[in-house]
Structure formats: structure tokens, C-alpha cells
Amino acid sequence: MARLLLFPSQACVDPGRHLLLHPPVSRPRAVRSGPPPAAPRRTGVVSLPGRCPPPLCWNHHPFLPCRSSKRGWVVFASENVQEISSHLPRKDERRSGNLLLRFSALPYCTMAWLSTAQLAQSSVGEKLNMVYEVGELFELGIQLSYLLILIGLLGAGTFFVIRQVLVRRELDLSAKELQEQVRSGDASATEYFELGAVMLRRKFYPAAIKYLQQAIDKWDRDEQDLAQVYNALGVSYKRENKLDKAIQQFQKAVELQPGYVTAWNNLGDAYEQQKDLKSALKAFEEVLLFDPNNKVARPRVDDLRPRVSMYKGVPVKSEKR
């Protein structure tokens, strides 16, 4: 059986014979009275509603009409299927073309929208990834800086601890050797002084006072060098809060060596602790005579001068201990 090709104008084509059926446009639609027509047979021709299929004209010209005397059908014979589209109504052609354009443009618009959305999403994702990476790098830098600071602090602390341990060990070894010499009775005044200085650095003040006093008793060298022994003995008394004895030792030290600025500073500090501001100011001024840029005496003089001028003429009792 031949297949049919239907068009919007309700014409049909029989591929077997290349027939084009089209109802006459100029003739009015006839109204038929009587019983309804029988169902058309499958002859490769489709009839219009209310009309019977016309007889086929096989031997006519491909595009010359063949009129039926009974039903008024017009039959066109076509040898080429491509020529059929030229006989379609122009309005139907334009409508079909518009529909095809719309439906064909829809997938392209959808794809363009999807691609734009994907690009926007990818750009946003890239920005978020960049921000996240920058945040990670910043956090990593902070952690590394904290780690370096911690390592530096630990290194500095370790250095000071090791240094203190080494100093303490050296002092212990020195004290041990000096004590052995003192026990043997062969120790000199210098060795007693060294042992007293070691005990002073180890903060064993009573032992330091004992050995320094023995060094003064056995001193047989230059008296100016003895000023250092008196100064160390005064520091030991001062650490024991025995300010009167400390001042006596400092005075002996500056008597033996007038330019001994360390003993003068210690003497001024001891007077200031006793609230004897005038004597303290005098001691610090003596330091500036020998060392005008002394970092210990200069600020103390600047602080004591206004205080002494304010209390001038008012007796200030010193606290004796």
C-alpha cells in the first residue's frame, strides 16, 4: 500500500504515483442531501470532508487539472516531490517557517543561557577559591610567624638558661677550688677576696662577708686595690639591709681610691635608702666630677636636686637600721 504525505492544506501525495490532490479554490462548497457517503477506500488518495474521492487521472500532464464531473475534484500529477512545495499556500509557508524558526531558536537560547549560567557559576567559584586560598596563605603566614617567635623566645630563653648554668657551674668549680685552698691554710688574701666575690655572686651574703673580711685582714698588696674589697664588702652588707655598715665600707673605698665611681654610686644609693637626700646628692655629684656622662649618676642628680631644694632648711631624720 502506498504511503501518504499530508500538508497543511489537506492535500495528499501518493509516493507511488506522485499525485497532488488539492480542492478547487474558486468553487463553492456543495451541500449534499441524502444519505452520507460511504467510507473511502485506501486508494492512495484522501478526500476532503463531505466529498468522495475523485477518479485518478494518471495520463495527464503533471500540473494540468483533471476535473471530475461528479465531485468537482482537481487532480495534479507531479513527477518530482520537491516541486510540491511550490504549490503550498504562502500564508501556510510563512507560518510554518516562523514556527520552525522559533522552535529551532529555542534550543540555542537554552544552551546560551545554560552556558552563561555555567560561566557565571564558574567565575564565582574561582573567586571563592581565590579568596579561600588567600585566607589559607594568610593564616599559614600568621602560624609561621607565631612559630618563629616561639622558636626565638625559646632560643633566647635557652641561651640565658644555659649561660646561667655555665656561670653557676664555673662559680661552683671556682668556689670548690678556693675552699680547698682555704681549708689547707695556704690561701692568700687575693684568694680570700675571690672566694668572697664568688659567694656574693651566688647570693651567699654571710659567707661573702666572712671571706671578704678575712681578705682585708690578710691584705698585703697595694692599698688602692684594697678599695675593691671594701666595695664588695659594702655591697654584701647592703644586700643584708645593714646600711650603716655598708656606708662605712663605701666611705673607706672612696678614701683609698677617690676616682672609684662605682663605690661613689653605691654610697649615694645607700644614703638615698636612708632618706639622707643631701648626702646622696653629694655622692652622685662626685661621680659626675669624674664621669660627667655617667648613666647612673646623671638621672639621680636630676631627680634629687629639686627634692633637696624643696626640703632645704627642714631636718630630715634618717632611718637607721
Swiss-Prot record:
Compartment(s) where it occurs, according to its Swiss-Prot or TrEMBL record: Plastid, Chloroplast thylakoid membrane
Q: Which PROSITE patterns match?
A: TPR (PS50005), TPR_REGION (PS50293)
A GO BP entry is: photosystem I assembly
Which keywords describe this protein according to UniProt?
A: Chloroplast, Membrane, Plastid, Repeat, Thylakoid, TPR repeat, Transit peptide, Transmembrane, Transmembrane helix
What is the membrane topology noted in the UniProt record heading this document? Multi-pass membrane protein
- Which Pfam families is this protein grouped with? TPR_16
| Renumbered ranges of TPR repeats | 189-222, 227-260, 261-294
Q: Which residues cross the membrane?
A: 98-120, 142-162
Query: What InterPro entries would the database entry show?
Result: SGT, TPR-like_helical_dom_sf, TPR_rpt
Q: Transit peptide located at which residues?
A: 1-29
The knockout outcome noted for this protein's gene is: Pale green phenotype.
Q: Which GO terms describe its cellular component?
A: chloroplast thylakoid membrane
Q: What does this protein do?
A: Nuclear genome-encoded factor required for the accumulation of photosystem I (PSI). Functions as a PSI biogenesis factor. Cooperates with PSA3 to promote the stable assembly of PSI in the thylakoid membrane. May target primarily the PsaC subunit.
Task: Report what the protein is called.
Answer: Tetratricopeptide repeat domain-containing protein PYG7, chloroplastic
Instruction: Provide the organism lineage as a comma list.
Output: Eukaryota, Viridiplantae, Streptophyta, Embryophyta, Tracheophyta
